[in-house]
């Protein structure tokens, strides 16, 4: 029996999760919602994906464009077992009451507060805590990136300080910036540290800057160690950590541009780089401090987490079976 999945919000994250669902042998994509008949809605229809209006109030937009929808969100909820809410930050919390009324499980994204769901989720760190849950929150792209690597060395961590160098906007976003400035988050810690703590219990402080780029985030991470660890040990740990890849400057990976080109060379859909990219040369231990630099593809690293969250909520597989199935279906390298 396949779990029937709906996607509320077919944008940057929603369309990637929708694609990922179609790659699973234990899930079925029932439909997606849009607020307007834009190119993404037309493309979904071309792909044979039923498109629903996100609400009754949006129906005139589709009618005026001659775009036939399969119904509204309410209709979609009658047909699914779980809805993946990929709406803009803050909307998910408002939508929760609708999902509760429909008796449908829901997955929220990192733009929502942790209190929106029963558990905040990163598969490799706390898969078991989502087993059988009705409401799960996949943490943000940045938080997912931090947890992927920090959970791998968690037993060594005394304290973490991470600087988040955030992209200003997604590639298709014309509304956000800056385009000629560096914008600091003047409140310390930034929200990322407390968000990490909703998944793994570590001491962490973060600060953040927004810079004029669209393709990836970069994190500069310093870990104070509570027991000895050498750089070669960290390399071994990361090499054996799922959804983390090591890249070398000597092989031409000098910036985020080459990392995205690597994803393109893999012929990944939307040049997705699901894995967290760690620069191997940046891994260094000085005294009791570990340093490393990593990059996060903000459009895609949370996608496999959404798939694993579905399996956990329906208790369809154990942690490593789910991760293996998801990785294999999406071409994740390890």
From Swiss-Prot:
Single GO molecular-function term? glyceraldehyde-3-phosphate dehydrogenase (NAD+) (phosphorylating) activity
> For this protein, what reaction is catalysed?
D-glyceraldehyde 3-phosphate + phosphate + NADP(+) = (2R)-3-phospho-glyceroyl phosphate + NADPH + H(+); D-glyceraldehyde 3-phosphate + phosphate + NAD(+) = (2R)-3-phospho-glyceroyl phosphate + NADH + H(+)
EC identifiers of the protein: 1.2.1.59
- Gene Ontology cellular-component terms listed: cytoplasm
**Which residues does NAD(+) bind?**
12-13, 111, 167, 298
Q: Where in the cell is it found?
A: Cytoplasm
Record pathway: Carbohydrate degradation; glycolysis; pyruvate from D-glyceraldehyde 3-phosphate: step 1/5
BP GO annotations: glycolytic process; lysine biosynthetic process via diaminopimelate
| Main subcellular location of this protein, as a coarse class | cytoplasm
- Broadest EC class assigned to this enzyme: oxidoreductase
**Subunit and interaction comment:** Homotetramer.
Q: Which family does it belong to?
A: Belongs to the glyceraldehyde-3-phosphate dehydrogenase family.
User: Which protein is depicted?
Assistant: Glyceraldehyde-3-phosphate dehydrogenase
């Amino acid at each position: 029996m396949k779990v029937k999945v709906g996607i509320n919000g077919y944008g940057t994250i929603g369309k990637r999760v929708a694609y990922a669902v179609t790659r699973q042998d234990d899930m079925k994509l029932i439909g997606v919602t849009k607020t307007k008949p834009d190119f993404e809605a037309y493309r979904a229809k071309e792909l044979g994906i039923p498109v629903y209006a996100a609400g009754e109030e949006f129906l005139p937009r589709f009618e005026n464009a001659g775009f036939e929808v399969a119904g509204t969100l309410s209709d979609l909820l009658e047909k699914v077992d779980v809805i993946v809410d990929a709406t803009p930050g803050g909307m998910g919390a408002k939508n929760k009451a609708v999902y509760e009324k429909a008796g449908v499980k829901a997955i929220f994204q990192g733009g929502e507060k942790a209190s929106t769901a029963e558990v905040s989720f990163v598969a490799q760190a706390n898969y078991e805590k989502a087993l059988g849950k009705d409401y799960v929150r996949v943490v943000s792209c940045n938080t997912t990136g931090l947890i992927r690597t920090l959970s791998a060395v968690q037993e060594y961590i005394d304290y973490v300080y991470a600087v988040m160098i955030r992209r200003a906007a997604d590639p298709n976003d014309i509304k956000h910036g800056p385009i000629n400035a560096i914008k600091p988050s003047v409140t310390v810690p930034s929200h990322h540290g407390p968000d990490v703590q909703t998944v793994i219990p570590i001491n962490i402080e973060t600060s953040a800057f927004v810079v004029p780029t669209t393709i990836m985030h970069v994190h500069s991470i310093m870990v104070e160690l509570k027991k000895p660890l050498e750089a070669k040990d960290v390399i071994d740990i990361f090499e054996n950590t799922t959804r983390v890849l090591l890249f070398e400057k000597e092989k031409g990976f000098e910036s985020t541009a080459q990392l995205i080109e690597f994803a393109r060379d893999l012929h990944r859909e939307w040049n997705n780089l699901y894995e967290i990219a760690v620069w191997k040369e940046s891994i260094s231990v000085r005294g009791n401090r570990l340093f490393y630099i990593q990059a996060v593809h903000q459009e895609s690293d949370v996608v496999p987490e959404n798939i694993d969250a579905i399996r956990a909520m329906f208790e369809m597989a154990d942690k490593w079976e789910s991760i293996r199935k998801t990785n294999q279906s999406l071409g994740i390298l390890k």
